[in-house]
Amino acid sequence: HWDRIALFQNNRSAEVGTLRPTSTDLHWHGYGEFAAMGPSDPLTPLHENVQQRPPWRITPSGWATRYGAVDPLIAAEDNGVVTVAAGDELTLSFAADALPKIPSGHQRRFFLWTVGWNKDADYHVAAGDRIEPLPWHGMDDARHGQEPRPAFASDALHQRFNTRWVGPLNYERVEAKRGEKKTGR
């Protein structure tokens, strides 16, 4: 598995600025249909072409982050994480007008830097059928799920935000904002 791919170009005139999200929204999006590509190409979901049921049979079960604003979970690079389930989408908004004006002849590019983990629902992944145990900074990635998770200050955030149950073969969901029941059938 790849941990990181990076390509850097040395450009001494480039200035790097940092923006924090001004708002967050975790919500249901659906499952992107896969693009028609060659058999040796990776599966590439299309964000615009959405279906309500997943193309796979098993979803890791456990407590996922509830829908709505999740600002406290991404406010710091700590052990507080947004637990995004399959079909979910996290929208981040930024105030780009807070950056300095672009000098003439220059252009601005944005790069989203994230810190997180991805867990596959794979029989070859330890505890691949469950959301928990949650990962943490400094864990032994090769032993994840075998060593106990230490207590962290961010555990209170998980108690507050991870209140949405997702499970295997779970095609029903609850619309958090309206409280009305929706089904993917």
Say what each PLM segment does:
Residues 2-185:
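Activation corresponds to long, low-complexity, non-globular regions
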